[in-house]
Every structure is written in C-alpha cells, then in structure tokens.
C-alpha cells in the first residue's frame, strides 16, 4: 500500500497565496458570474476541519437555485450594505477601526512604515487606505509568492491583532454568501495564526475542482 503524496511546501504556500487573493477579491468587490460558478463547483476534501466546513458553506452559498444575474445583482447590493455603506457598512474592514476605534489612526501609520520598508507602493487605482483588509491580504499573497521571510512579521504585526475578529463580524451578517465568506476568513486566519506561531508546515484544506 502506498500513501497519497502530500503537497510540497511550495504547493502549500501557493495555495495559501491563492486563498489570500481570493479573500481579497471577494472583500473588495462582488464576484462575477465566472467566479461564482467556480466557487459553486468546488469539491472540498471533507477532513472534519473547520476550514473544510467553511469552504463547503461558501460553495453552497455561491450555488443556490437563484438565476445567476439576479444573484449577482443581489450580492452587489449586499456587498455595499455589509462592507461599504453610505457612511460605513455593517462591517468596517480597516485595521485602524478595529485596533484604534477610528479610521486613519496609528495602525495605518505603522502599516505604511512597514510597507515602505518592504518596498510596497500604494496603487493609484484605489481610494481605500492601505489598512483595508483586502489590501493586507494582497500583501500577504505577494510576500508568499516571493518566499519572503517577512511573512510572519507582517502577519503578526498587521493581521493577527484584528483580522479574525473582523471576519467573525462579517460572519454574522444576514446574507448567506457574505456570512460564509466571513466565517471562512476567520477560520483561515486561525489557521495562519497557528502556522506563524509554530513556524511549521501546516497545510490549508485542499480544494479540488470538479
């Protein structure tokens, strides 16, 4: 009998980077029809973990029985209500808000210093401050892609203190898709916290397309 080959460290890290990018995309904007279909058709290895359960919930929320264009229109409205808002959404996905109680505060100042030190420059195409959760997830994806030794430092300094709480708050909203997204984000942050704490080769739940 032979055991199935486990993912290599590089494969596991590539998956981590992809998850960060996916979460960032879904936090920034409504998924299009192609992404919704991809999520709906995911097959998850059911290993009993919270991550696997959360992936399954997101996939089921992306599927549903609703006509695709109507679903996207509904999700656009939900995204605005939950994450943007006229003044602010149900969830305010900024580090300063969670760590300092106000926007544009000390957490953003410290983040900007570290981003400069790491060589990152703010995109001219975004109006969001750099401490938006999606932006931090994008930075983590790039650090992983670059096999940077600064991953743990950046995560512990700028994500660990608040990201799981922010995602947990999103997990309480009344739209199934965004609640599932928040729960997945929270579970993934817990997984990443464990990885960073022990600096071990923890492998996130494997996702297989049908």
PLM region spans:
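Surface/interface-facing alpha-helical segments and adjacent flexible terminal/loop regions used
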Residues: 1-210
């Amino acid at each position: 009998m032979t055991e199935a080959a486990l993912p290599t460290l590089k494969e596991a890290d590539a998956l981590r980077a992809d998850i960060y990018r996916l979460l960032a995309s879904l936090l920034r904007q409504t998924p299009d029809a192609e992404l919704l279909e991809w999520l709906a058709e995911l097959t998850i290895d059911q290993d009993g973990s919270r991550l696997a359960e959360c992936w399954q919930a997101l996939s089921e929320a992306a599927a549903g029985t609703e006509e695709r264009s109507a679903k996207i229109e509904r999700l656009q409205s939900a995204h605005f209500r939950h994450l943007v808002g006229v003044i602010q959404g149900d969830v305010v996905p900024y580090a300063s808000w969670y760590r300092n109680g106000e926007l544009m505060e000390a957490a953003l100042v410290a983040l900007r210093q570290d981003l400069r030190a790491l060589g990152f420059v703010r995109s001219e195409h975004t109006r969001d401050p750099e401490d938006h959760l999606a932006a931090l997830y994008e930075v983590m994806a790039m650090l992983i892609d670059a096999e940077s030794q600064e991953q743990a430092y950046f995560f512990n300094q700028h994500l660990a203190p608040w990201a799981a709480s922010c995602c947990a708050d999103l997990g309480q909203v009344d739209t199934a898709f965004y609640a599932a997204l928040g729960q997945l984000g929270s579970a993934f942050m817990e997984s990443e916290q464990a990885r960073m704490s022990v600096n071990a080769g923890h492998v996130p739940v494997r996702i297989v397309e049908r």
